[in-house]
Amino acid sequence: MARDTISTWNRSQVDEDAMGAAHAPIWRRMIDVAAPTDLSRSTVLDYGCNQGGFLRLLYDRHPFRSAIGIDIARESVARAELLKGHRPIDYRLGDQAAALGQTFDLAFSHEVIYLLPDVAAHARDTKTALRPGGAYVAAMGCHTDSSLWPRWRALIAESSSIPIYDHSLEEVSKAFTETGFSVSVRPLALDAFMPFTIGSAYFPKVVDQLRYYSSDKVVFRFVRVP
């Protein structure tokens, strides 16, 4: 069931606009570990595209044939359209990939699954939108297996315009397996320096940040079984 649209995901416009730069090292790592080098004949979907930064980065590194990014945030999608330049990307309002009426070779999402009430429904929707053998790469650090989640849940709830949900890594794996995907997973294992802020609400200690980016944050690869 499609959800109502919103203006922006983050209630703070300043924080909303800052997300792209903050997420760029993570996106680069996702691309490094999960994106094929040659995407020249591939169609790509970005689920929860926000202001469109991931697909712009992906195209600049590995040009694809075409891509669609979907999101329920109206202002973010409009911003993504303004920023896409010459790239063959179409940003649209929505949260149902199947409603796009086409199939994709590759799909991505970054920190989207914890914002969805029904993981199994998301798996079914993704399956409809992927060609047989196509892959969905989903990065996820907001899950109940992370020791930081109780703290983060409260913090994110203060800024998110939509509800957040408690999903475990096992729950996500089970939902996609039962929907007809082969499931594999690895730690993101970020290989970049990340700024540390003394007194950070999200990372009280340096070791919290190190653990999060080395083990808590994972990258799933769901391949639609032919």
Which sequence ranges carry the predicted segments?
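Acceptor-substrate binding/catalytic loop of class I
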Residues: 154-171
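A C-terminal cap/extension of S-adenosyl-L-methionine-dependent methyltransferases
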Residues: 151-154, 184-226
